[in-house]
Amino acid sequence: MDWATFWSAASAIATTAAAFVAVWAIFRWKKQDELKAKMAFKLAIADYKYLILQLPDQFDKEELRNKYSNERKKLTDLLSACNHAWLVTEDLLLSHDLIVSNWSNILDTHAHYLQGSRQSEELVIFCNAILSKKFIFS
């Protein structure tokens, strides 16, 4: 038996196995990053909803808008965080029509709520629709 041939074959087999493990790891890594992006969006929506629940139902009076000016700014910052998380998903959620439509509704309603022409309940409904959908592990 030629030991050089034997060790060459063993090395080739080990290299092939290592290549398969590397490809598998890269695939899993990509899936893990997708999961993190979806989770970040859902958590951002949860934070946004949490603040909405602490605010008045409607900012229909100037005194309310003034009293809650810091919270209104924070709500806009949280919407920005939601938008950032949405962008990071890089179209992973576009196949979920319910998510897309409710996210669009949040974007459309946010400014109207802060100006006093819409109620917080609308935003809560849109947030709940997103939060109740199981899309992270799908």
Where are the language model's segments positioned?
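Membrane-embedded hydrophobic alpha-helical segments
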Residues: 1-29
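Amphipathic alpha-helical "stem/stalk" segments
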Residues: 31-138
